[in-house]
């Protein structure tokens, strides 16, 4: 078997946008509007991602390539095709941070925490192997361990591991990941999940190889003060009229420039939205195909840069981040909940997020950004527990609601999110 090979895809995801957007203005009412916008874009993302969720999918950035093992090494470490017939006593989970660990600790029925790296589920010891993603360390560690999976002692085998959207196909398109149907998980079990979360981890043979508890729909995150000053309102439904499609968006950019605002911080802010809405793959019949929507991004971006309505900064750069503050004079960014919760200086005095100054609306097109998926490792000797964790943590509606309330995740369960949106007592 060949070692996992890197495949490009989209980036990362974590939480929904309710926590910080509207701290001081019509708080409960606006939060419901934000959640409504997220629900809308989640449905749009589900309709669109199928065009790009394969090896040939467009991507904003590829993860660093993990070293590929030699053919000889791969051939000598063939992974067992079937899970063990007897359940093991040690359950090994590989991930890159504490997020899933905290979800399992807090929400999986019967989980007992022993210490920072160990837990118990019944008679089974849960061991957490957490390697940060810095310098590709997580993937390197995971790759090296998967290559030894077939020959590993039962207590050392990986049972479950996590992947992100940007490199999911690297693992999905190998035999190191189990089809969820082989775990006994049916289409009916997953019927309430957003389709795009399935498309991202479906291999080239149509097998679903992972399941996520999260949804990461993206929205247009706008500066409410700028909206009031230039558009006359910061109401999401009214702001949406000024950004409802790309032509309207670019027309609004002219108004923002006249008032001293950049429409977006950088042309790179909009790339993911355009690229999530392509009609086909990068490679078709052996030929590179550049989608019309990507060419529209090029044309629209050039016009906006030439008109000095935006910049060309790299995402995550200091210049790109200046718009997190009022003096940065940026009207909007595009992203899911984790962007504002973790990346827009929400805890920093004087930032727009800290002052409750961001609003959200659907924007010109639906899109998603990121996500974390649970994969069962081929060769696991704990297939029944892998199945139960996936079902409990991604399909149990009560647990999904618990996660929304406790962790502010936008969960991958349509009835749960619709119920939370309608629940007048819910405030994040």
Model-derived features with residue positions:
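Hinge/lid segment of periplasmic solute-binding proteins
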Residues: 75, 79-83, 136-139, 150, ...
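Extracytoplasmic/periplasmic substrate-recognition and gating elements
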Residues: 89, 122, 147, 347-416
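Short helix-initiation/N-cap motifs at beta->coil->alpha
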Residues: 130-144, 244-248, 312-326
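C-terminal motif of bacterial Sec signal peptides marking the signal peptidase cleavage site
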Residues: 46-50
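Glycine-centered hinge/linker elements that transmit conformational signals in sensory
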Residues: 248-257, 286-318, 357
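Periplasmic solute-binding protein
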Residues: 165-181, 195-238, 250, 266-287, ...
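Conserved N-terminal structural module of periplasmic/extracytoplasmic solute-binding proteins
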Residues: 14, 36, 52-169, 187, ...
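Short, Lys/Arg-enriched N-terminal segments with co-localized hydrophobic residues
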Residues: 6-29
């Amino acid at each position: 078997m060949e070692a996992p090979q890197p495949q490009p895809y989209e980036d990362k995801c974590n939480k929904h946008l309710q926590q910080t957007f509207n701290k001081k203005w019509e708080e409960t009412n606006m939060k419901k509007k934000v959640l409504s916008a997220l629900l809308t874009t989640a449905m749009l993302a589900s309709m669109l991602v199928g065009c790009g969720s394969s090896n040939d999918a467009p991507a904003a950035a590829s993860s660093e390539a993990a070293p590929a093992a030699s053919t000889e090494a791969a051939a000598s470490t063939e992974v067992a095709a079937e899970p063990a017939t007897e359940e093991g006593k040690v359950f090994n989970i590989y991930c890159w941070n504490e997020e899933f660990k905290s979800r399992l600790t807090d929400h999986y029925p019967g989980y007992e925490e022993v210490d920072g790296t160990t837990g118990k589920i019944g008679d089974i010891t849960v061991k957490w192997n957490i390697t940060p993603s810095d310098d590709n360390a997580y993937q390197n560690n995971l790759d090296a361990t998967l290559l030894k999976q077939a020959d590993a002692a039962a207590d050392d085998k990986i049972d479950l591991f996590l992947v992100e959207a940007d490199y999911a196909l690297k693992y999905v398109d190998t035999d190191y990941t189990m089809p969820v149907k082989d775990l006994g998980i049916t289409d009916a079990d997953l019927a309430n999940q957003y389709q795009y979360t399935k498309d991202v981890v479906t291999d080239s043979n149509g097998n679903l190889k992972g399941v996520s508890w999260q949804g990461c729909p993206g929205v247009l995150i706008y500066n409410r003060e700028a909206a009031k000053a230039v558009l006359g309102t910061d109401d999401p439904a009214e702001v949406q009229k000024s950004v409802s499609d790309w032509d309207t968006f670019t027309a609004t950019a002219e108004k923002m420039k006249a008032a001293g605002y950049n429409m977006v911080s950088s042309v790179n802010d909009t790339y993911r939205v355009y690229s999530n809405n392509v009609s086909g793959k990068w490679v078709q019949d052996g030929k590179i195909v550049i989608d019309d929507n990507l060419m529209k991004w090029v044309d629209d971006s050039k016009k906006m840069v030439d008109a000095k309505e935006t910049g060309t900064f790299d995402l995550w750069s200091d210049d790109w981040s200046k718009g997190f503050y009022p003096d940065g004079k940026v009207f909007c960014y595009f992203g899911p909940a984790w962007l504002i919760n973790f990346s827009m200086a929400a805890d920093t005095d004087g930032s727009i997020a800290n002052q409750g100054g961001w609003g959200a609306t659907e924007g010109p097109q639906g899109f998603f950004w990121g996500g974390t998926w649970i994969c069962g490792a081929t060769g696991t000797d704990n297939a029944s527990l892998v199945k139960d964790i996936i079902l409990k943590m991604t399909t149990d509606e009560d647990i999904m609601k618990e996660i929304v309330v406790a962790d502010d995740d936008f969960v991958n369960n349509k009835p749960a999110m619709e119920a939370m949106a309608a629940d007048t007592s819910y405030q994040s």
